[in-house]
């Protein structure tokens, strides 16, 4: 049995993860970490420093500002940390990269199987289409999401950029009077209602448009992905920065 400590256990995703964990025979949430605790089937600690029990994997699905406290705990325990939060700064990402040299860390901007398959497809199709097609990314989320563009949109955009040999640049939204440049990758964010998460990658050519689309129907898809990452990381002891590609066996 893999024992999980869930940071952000009382948030929207934390509640869904707690519910979905009961479907995994080899996983158990033994404790949670949350500043605003409510009654659960497991004990809740307000900060990582307060945690006083043993665990196998630390799962974070909260906010980016929790990162340093979680890394400090991981440095003490040497247990794997699964990072599912988004909205990290470049400094945060550099810190994760640095700590992964000595700690087993996992990070993904999106925990769904579908998004990660699309990301894998982009590595293959982008070099074939770029040059004859303009590339734009549109992401849609609920009106409570604080980071923009979404971590997933950034993930997809980075994959596209890394797949192109030429110099490209990101353009976030469009306004005013200016013609689109050939080397642009457009990224657009929409916030409204209760949209769980929609992502469209558009390759617009002359006479045709190719789209890769993903629509999350419920948060359960992210919860299951996070728990599968815990299954995988529960078997890992070597330092490194692991991703969903490792979990689902995608080779780059």
From Swiss-Prot:
InterPro entries: DapB_C (IPR022663), DapB_N (IPR000846), DapB_N_CS (IPR022664), DHDPR_bac (IPR023940), NAD(P)-bd_dom_sf (IPR036291). It catalyses: (S)-2,3,4,5-tetrahydrodipicolinate + NAD(+) + H2O = (2S,4S)-4-hydroxy-2,3,4,5-tetrahydrodipicolinate + NADH + H(+); (S)-2,3,4,5-tetrahydrodipicolinate + NADP(+) + H2O = (2S,4S)-4-hydroxy-2,3,4,5-tetrahydrodipicolinate + NADPH + H(+). It comes from the Bacteria. Keywords: Amino-acid biosynthesis, Cytoplasm, Diaminopimelate biosynthesis, Lysine biosynthesis, NAD, NADP, Oxidoreductase. It is an enzyme of class 1 (oxidoreductase). It is found in: Cytoplasm. SUPFAM superfamilies: Glyceraldehyde-3-phosphate dehydrogenase-like, C-terminal domain (SSF55347), NAD(P)-binding Rossmann-fold domains (SSF51735). GO terms for molecular function: 4-hydroxy-tetrahydrodipicolinate reductase; NAD binding; NADP binding; oxidoreductase activity, acting on CH or CH2 groups, NAD or NADP as acceptor. Its EC number is 1.17.1.8. This is 4-hydroxy-tetrahydrodipicolinate reductase. It comes from Clostridium botulinum (strain Alaska E43 / Type E3). The gene is dapB.
């Amino acid at each position: 049995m893999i024992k999980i400590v869930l940071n952000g256990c009382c948030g929207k995703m934390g509640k869904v993860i707690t519910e979905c964990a009961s479907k995994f025979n080899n996983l158990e949430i033994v404790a949670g970490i949350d500043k605003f605790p409510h009654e659960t089937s497991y004990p809740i600690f307000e900060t990582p420093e307060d945690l006083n029990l043993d665990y196998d994997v630390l799962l974070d699905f909260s906010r980016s500002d929790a990162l340093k406290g979680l890394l400090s705990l991981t440095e003490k325990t040497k247990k794997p940390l699964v990072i599912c939060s988004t909205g990290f700064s470049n400094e945060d990402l550099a810190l994760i990269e640095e700590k992964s040299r000595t700690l087993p860390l996992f990070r993904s901007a999106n925990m769904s199987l579908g998004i990660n398959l699309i990301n894998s497809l982009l590595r293959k199709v982008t070099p074939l289409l770029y040059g004859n097609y303009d590339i734009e990314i549109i992401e849609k989320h609920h009106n409570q999401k604080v980071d923009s563009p979404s971590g997933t949109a950034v993930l997809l955009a980075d994959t596209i950029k890394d797949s192109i040999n030429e110099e490209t640049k990101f353009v976030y939204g469009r306004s005013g009077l200016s013609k689109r440049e050939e080397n642009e990758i457009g990224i657009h964010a929409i916030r409204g209602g209760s949209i769980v998460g929609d992502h469209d990658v558009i390759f617009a050519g002359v006479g045709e448009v190719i789209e890769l689309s993903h629509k999350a129907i419920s948060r359960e898809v992210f919860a299951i992905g996070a728990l599968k990452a815990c299954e995988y990381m529960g078997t890992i002891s070597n330092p490194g920065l692991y991703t969903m590609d490792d979990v689902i066996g995608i080779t780059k």
